[in-house]
A protein has these predicted regions:
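C-terminal alpha-helical "lid/dimerization" subdomain adjacent to the S-adenosyl-L-methionine
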Residues: 4, 8-9, 15-16, 46, ...
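Conserved alpha-helix/loop element of class I SAM-dependent methyltransferases that forms part
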Residues: 16-34
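Class I SAM-dependent methyltransferase SAM/SAH-binding core
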Residues: 37-85
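A conserved beta-strand element that flanks and buttresses the S-adenosyl-L-methionine
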Residues: 97
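C-terminal lobe and adjacent flexible extensions of AdoMet/dcAdoMet transferase-like proteins
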Residues: 183-195
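A short glycine-rich, Lys/Arg-flanked "PGG" loop and its adjoining helix->strand segment in the class I
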Residues: 109-121
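Short catalytic micro-motifs in class I SAM-dependent methyltransferases
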Residues: 100-101
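Local beta-strand N-terminus motif with an aromatic residue
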Residues: 33, 93-94
Length: 195
């Protein structure tokens, strides 16, 4: 299969829009001295701005060309791996983010399961995705299908359901236009919730 991301790597940061930094920091609970995994993080365009607010950032992606771009930014630790089979121990990361990438994962159920596995109890997972119920995103989904990118967009309801089934507490926000965020917290048995 043609690798669109290796081709786009040198210009990716120039053509892809900036993200909502303040919202991402709030949802992740940053600044905090935490270990952060940027799953599907590509060139590090998002995590390079989060790095100063954490103690360690690991970027996991399949595209070697994207990871080379990330390595050039400094402070980011690139790891080439499938998100469905992460090469990390259980309970390794305090925070995980997935920005505009979940729809590119081959098996989203397996990816979310493994992300929860490597998240520490009490840790947060934040997913930012285009809202496929919006007309503009439906058009993007069609274009990605025609480009043979293998994308599969999920609604936030579906993502929430998967995360609930994995035992996560969730919170959803949207920008009222075409982006949503799912924040999921892994229960911590040492700090029971009495609500």
């Amino acid at each position: 299969m043609f690798d669109h991301f290796n081709l786009a790597a040198p210009i990716y940061d120039k053509i892809i829009r900036i993200y909502d930094h303040e919202r991402m920091c709030r949802l992740l609970g940053l600044p905090a001295k935490v270990r952060l995994l940027d799953a599907g993080g590509g060139t590090g365009r998002v995590s390079r701005r989060l790095y100063p607010l954490t103690c360690q950032v690991v970027i996991c992606d399949l595209s070697q060309a994207m990871l080379r771009q990330a390595a050039d930014k400094g402070g980011l630790n690139p790891v080439r791996a499938h998100v469905e089979r992460l090469p990390f121990d259980d309970d390794r990361f305090d925070r995980i983010l997935v920005v505009d990438a979940l729809h590119h994962f081959c098996n989203q159920q397996e990816a979310l399961t493994d992300l929860v596995r490597v998240l520490k109890p009490g840790g947060r997972l934040v997913i930012e995705e285009p809202d496929v119920t919006r007309p503009i995103v439906k058009l993007i989904a069609l274009m990605e299908k025609l480009a043979l990118m293998g994308s599969r967009f999920l609604t936030f309801h579906r993502i929430e359901r998967i995360l609930h089934d994995l035992g996560m507490a969730t919170h959803v926000e949207d920008d009222g236009r075409y982006i949503f965020w799912v924040q999921a917290t892994k229960p911590d048995p040492a700090k029971p919730d009495y609500d």
